Swiss-Prot record:
Gene Ontology MF terms in the entry: ATP binding; ATP hydrolysis activity; ATP-dependent protein folding chaperone; protein dimerization activity; unfolded protein binding; zinc ion binding
The ClpX-type ZB domain, residue ranges: 2-56
Binding site for Zn(2+): C15, C18, C37, C40
Keywords annotated in UniProt: ATP-binding, Chaperone, Metal-binding, Nucleotide-binding, Zinc
Family indicated by similarity: Belongs to the ClpX chaperone family.
Function: ATP-dependent specificity component of the Clp protease. It directs the protease to specific substrates. Can perform chaperone functions in the absence of ClpP.
CDD domains, per database record: RecA-like_ClpX
GO cellular component terms, A-Z: HslUV protease complex
Residues at which ATP binds: P120, T121, G122, S123, G124, K125, T126, L127
Listed name of the protein: ATP-dependent Clp protease ATP-binding subunit ClpX
Gene: clpX
Length: 424
């Protein structure tokens, strides 16, 4: 097509769509025996844009994974915690279904379901949240509740959480409003006593109060591109009612609170029922019976608990589960180190007894899955230090004695020469 004012005969030209002459428009574009003006081009673009907006939600609805699909994906990366996965899958599915139907269905407003994860250190709380965000392809950010303070005090303002989320998606507000925020160590902002204090608790109850509106849903004013706030500045307006908040914490001591409530057999004197150690419920079993009243007694304020209606509890990982974590997930720790050694052209083998020894060590340390990496890293440190300087190494073997610190990894050379790594 070409831009024309007159045809070769000097005849006045008109737009074939709106009928305006070439003198009434800025541009007239010629096609085979037809003309279109710049105004009609703009109008066509507007029509197409509107239609794309209408079609997009229908495409998104069909692409929303079901709870079963979400659960299956979590199974690929997270070992155990079956009940927590099910709770998360349903809550996340309902949240994004609400967003894609405009927050209401047949005039009924759909409430927001934020999530509270309760479980010991290293049980998979953070990994579950990260895996969900990656699977759903939505922006994800983490915040540490212990660094947060009320606005006006030294520390991190709660609205900085939204700023971090915006940074993850290049300050695209629409993308950020579909994101997931994980707030860790939420148990550390419990108030210091059951009774409301007349003094300010800026890092405990004060932070809970500051988080209330953010989690429930408010329009957060965030400075563009991470600048500081000042009165003359234009702010980005972010609707937090569309953001899914997942709060997690170990809640050490919460099991004792639940035990006090559920222990109906307590008594004094000769008729008292005394439970043996075998009859006592485990921490994981007790946490699965958590109720809002227990969390209030622990130190969370009722209004804050009300904003986290979906509660999922995670159990402490067993030795068998830790061995599975080392071996089975798509990004299992042993697979990561094997890939690292493959970059050097070396095969890395973990014997079964080595995996058992790693799991036992993590159980003793009570660090859960989080402590596995440090154990493996310590066992492989000397080998990873020496390996780039060694030639003809085909294979490195890790057995139980290496994990126990009694020997160095076994190096197998190309000419079938075998020796212990340096240090022996």
């Amino acid at each position: 097509m070409t831009d024309k004012r007159k045809d070769g005969s000097g005849k006045l030209l008109y737009c074939s769509f709106c009928g305006k002459s070439q003198h009434e428009v800025r541009k007239l574009i010629a096609g085979p025996s037809v003309y279109i003006c710049d105004e009609c081009v703009d109008l066509c673009n507007d029509i197409i844009r509107e239609e794309i907006k209408e079609v997009a939600p229908h495409r998104e609805r069909s692409a929303l994974p079901t709870p079963h699909e979400i659960r299956r994906h979590l199974d690929d990366y997270v070992i155990g915690q079956e009940q927590a996965k099910k709770v998360l899958a349903v809550a996340v599915y309902n949240h994004y279904k609400r967003l894609r139907n405009g927050d209401s269905s047949n005039g009924i407003e759909l409430g927001k379901s934020n999530i509270l994860l309760i479980g010991p250190t290293g049980s998979g709380k953070t990994l579950l949240a990260e895996t969900l965000a990656r699977f759903l392809d939505v922006p994800f950010t983490m915040a540490d509740a212990t660094t947060l303070t009320e606005a006006g005090y030294v520390g991190e303002d709660v609205e900085n959480i939204i700023q971090k989320l915006l940074q993850k998606c290049d300050y695209d507000v629409q993308k950020a409003q579909r994101g997931i925020v994980y707030i860790d160590e939420i148990d550390k902002i419990s108030r210091k006593s059951d009774n409301p204090s007349i003094t300010r608790d800026v890092s405990g109850e004060g932070v809970q109060q500051a988080l209330l509106k953010l989690i429930e849903g408010t329009i957060a004013a965030v400075p563009p591109q991470g600048g500081r706030k000042h009165p003359q500045q234009e702010f980005l307006q972010v609707d937090t009612s569309k953001i899914l908040f997942i709060c997690g914490g170990a809640f050490a001591g919460l099991d004792k609170v639940i035990e006090q409530r559920t222990d109906t057999g307590r008594g004094i004197g000769f008729n008292a029922t005394v439970k043996g150690s075998a009859e006592k419920a485990t921490e994981g079993e007790l946490l699965s019976h958590v109720e809002p009243g227990d969390l209030i007694k622990f130190g969370l304020i009722p209004e804050f608990i009300g904003r986290l209606p979906v509660v999922a509890t995670l159990r402490e990982l067993s030795e068998d589960a830790l061995i599975q974590i080392l071996r089975e997930p798509k990004n299992a720790l042993t697979k990561q180190y094997q890939a690292l050694f493959n970059l050097e052209g070396v095969e890395l083998e973990f014997r079964d007894e080595a995996l058992t020894a790693i799991a036992k060590k993590a159980m003793v340390r009570k660090t859960g899955a989080r402590g596995l990496r440090s154990i493996v890293e310590a066992a492989l440190l000397e080998t990873m230090y020496d390996l780039p300087s060694l030639e003809s190494v085909d294979k490195v073997v890790i057995d139980e004695s290496v994990i126990a610190g009694h020997s160095e990894p076994l190096l197998i050379y190309g000419k079938h020469e075998t020796q212990q790594a340096s240090g022996e």
